[in-house]
């Protein structure tokens, strides 16, 4: 969602692909890459995965498609030969904080592309950082603090509807995210299509957001 919103705001023609984790696993896979590239895509940007996708990136390169990897998982012996690899612990980098969540790494790319500090995305960063169960220190602590402020001041309509369905009227804090919002969003991965989550978080219409929130709440 974070990078889709970023790229759309820059005028890019964007489509998203969320793999079925039961059929395709968590990381990139050759079948998905082939299907995406054959549809006419010329650039694939991964979020929270890809650092182990050496063969998949090689396939994409052979088919004329660039790949940008954003990931925070452990770097393997071989790093994919992607157009760019954005990772807080990249051996050729000197980033001072290596414990960013996957969404935090994606946020860094959004920041660079937009050339402004995209504070309007910090609600997503806060939710993703808490959900990823990374250390809430350093930048992660700042992201979560700023994101929670945004969630309380101007929550996305989908989040607002989800909280209303459960009669949660208190201020959102780390516990609200960790014990309610994040588990609800994670449960979407067990649905027939994880695209529900994308539609839910990007919903702008209250009616649509309520329908999606009810589906998630079931």
For the regions a language model picked out, list residue spans one by one.
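Short alpha-helices
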Residues: 80-130, 138
